[in-house]
Structure formats: structure tokens, C-alpha cells
Amino acid sequence: MKNKSALLLLALLFTVTASAVDSKLFVDNWLFTLTDSTKMSLHDYNDSSWRKLTLPHDWSIEGDFLATNPSGASGGALPGGIGWYRKHFDINDYAKNKRYYIDFDGVYMNSTVYVNGVELGTRPYGYSSFRYDITQYVKKNGNVVAVRVDNSDQPNSRWYSGCGIYRNVYLVETENIHVAHWGSFVTASQNGDMNIDISIDNKTNSKDKITVRNSIVDFHGRVVAVSSSVSLANGNAI
């Protein structure tokens, strides 16, 4: 059982040609205000008076414990409300032939995300991670991401949830052909047989031939390599 467990972990050491993923922690130099205005989503909005902070952040725990707070006892008797986060950023190694994403591990709750004034979408609730493709909206310099967080409808939880971007955020850069988000899945049977499923996403305008290489290394240094080539149409995933 011990050998099988180690083998399973080592099976994750796979590489995919032209699929490099550069995921950078994106938590420093955010700005925050516990107020609300639709203008706060605009690229050129004046946020110079906002509070500067590092994520993760929970504005609720910074408030006062009051019996009159609508969150009630289950919410810690702490305030909710609506808050905004903004971050100015550059992409120093920006390239037009790359893909760019922003990943949120968790925002509580009802978050709406904007990049350079463009609304990307709204994520209800607050416990799931989510991603937006920002490739067509970003440039090398002078980018702004804005996040509206609405936890004003109280009470909404059976326990203390907090408010805000309470988990990490990542800026992700990939090739146009890359392993899909959450695109690797490894399973093993009782007798030690292993199955590795890899999803590949093609964002190019052409049909490409790709090679997926999976390597399994045992305790004796023996390597078993399996390679397969497939054609992948543009805009598709396998």
C-alpha cells in the first residue's frame, strides 16, 4: 500500500509540450473601501483615498460585535455590507500570443469582477473557487481589476462566514495550447493499475498535433513513459 501511494503521487510529475502554466500569487497592493458606487468599476476611478492591504482580507471581523447586527448570533453578530477592492497592475512579460486568467480561491459573497472597466461576471455565494479569462482585456501596463463584494443580505449562513476576498488570488499565464484548468485527474485501482486523464485546451486558430507525456517513477528509479499524439481542432478541448 505504501508503494502504491508513492507511485500515485509520482504519477503527477507529468509534462505537456507547449503547456507551461505560470501562476503568480496576486495578493499584494490591493485597495479597499466599505462603500458602494457603480463608478468604482471604472478604469480611471480615483481610488487614492482607499485603504491599502494584502489579501486575504475579511472586513467583517474588523467590525464591532453588536447584537443589532443583522447577521445574528450564527454570523458572529458582526457587520456585513458591500465592499469594493481594486488593484493596479502591469504584466511585465506580456505577450500577445499568451493567455491570461485571474483565479479566485474564494470571495464571500456575490462578487462581481471587472478588468479595465469590463464586467467579467458575477459569482454567487462564496465558498467555491472561480476563474475568468482576461486575455482580451489586459495589456502590458496600466491594468486595473475591481471586485464588488455584496454580503448585505443577512443572515445568510449557519456559521460565521466573514466578508470579502478571504482566500488567495492568482494571475495565471499560459500558452494558447495548455492543460485545461483542473485538467489532470489520476485514479488507481486496488491492484495498482493507474489511469491518468489529461484535458488539453487549444485556443489557437489552427488544428495542431500535440504530444502528452506522462511519467511514472518507482522507488528504484525505473521510469515508465507513455506518449500519445492527437490532432486537436482550434477552440476545442480533449
Predicted regions and their residues:
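Accessory carbohydrate-binding/adhesion or oligomerization-edge regions at the termini
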Residues: A20-S71, V144-R148, S152
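Accessory beta-strand-rich segments of carbohydrate-active enzymes
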Residues: K24-F26, F32-D36, G80-F185, K203-T204, ...
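Short, solvent-exposed loop/linker segments at the N-terminal edge
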Residues: V186-G192
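Short, P/G- and charge-enriched loop/turn segments at secondary-structure junctions
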Residues: S71-A77, F185
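Short, surface-exposed linear segments at secondary-structure transitions and domain or protein termini
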Residues: T35, K52, Y132, A233-I238
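Bacterial N-terminal signal peptides
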Residues: L8-T15
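Bacterial N-terminal signal peptides that target proteins for export
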Residues: M1-L7
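Beta-strand-rich binding/interaction modules
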Residues: V115, D193-L232, A237-I238
